[in-house]
């Protein structure tokens, strides 16, 4: 049976990415990097499951999801744009094997950064960011999720590549 997740807040992270915060059921268990099958608790959408990564930590008092939207597709992520505080998502199950296995280079493109959001939060909380590096590819500067946070956290170890925009201070390709 699906867990009901009441939405506490919805914020725009970028022009096409939402940050959704929900209440957290007591029995939910997951680790940084894992995802959940989520649907929207509205007629015709309850069985439209999509995988979204937890961007909160297991010890947080709420759940957070950072989700790229695709309004032109008229699908689940477009429906997320219609939600408001008090609406409900349905959590159908937790899965995934992405986990921190030691210092190294994290490589992400666009919304593919979401498993690393929670992993870097955990490393920061534990004081173990170390010499980890993040190579983050996006189409444009406006697409970069949590840019200020990663600049502050990683400094020179936060490397950005833009594929559709040439800007000083960013790799291009």
Across the structure, where does each feature detected by a protein language model lie?
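Ferredoxin-reductase
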Residues: 2-85, 138-140, 163-165
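FNR/FR-type flavoprotein reductase catalytic core
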Residues: 72-173
């Amino acid at each position: 049976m699906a867990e009901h997740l009441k939405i506490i807040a919805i914020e725009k992270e970028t022009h096409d990415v939402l940050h959704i915060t929900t209440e957290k059921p007591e029995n939910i268990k997951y680790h940084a990097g894992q995802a959940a099958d989520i649907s929207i608790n509205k007629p015709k959408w309850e069985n439209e499951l999509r995988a979204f990564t937890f961007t909160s930590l297991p010890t947080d008092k709420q759940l957070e999801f950072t989700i790229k939207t695709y309004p032109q597709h008229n699908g689940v992520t477009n429906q997320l744009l219609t939600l408001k505080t008090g609406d409900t998502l349905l959590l159908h199950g937790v899965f995934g094997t992405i986990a921190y296995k030691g210092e190294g280079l994290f490589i992400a493109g666009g919304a593919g950064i979401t498993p690393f959001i929670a992993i870097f939060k955990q490393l920061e909380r534990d004081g173990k960011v170390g010499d980890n590096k993040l190579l983050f590819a996006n189409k444009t500067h406006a697409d970069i999720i949590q840019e200020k946070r990663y600049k502050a956290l990683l400094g020179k170890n936060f490397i950005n590549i833009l594929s559709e925009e040439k800007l000083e201070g960013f790799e291009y390709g």
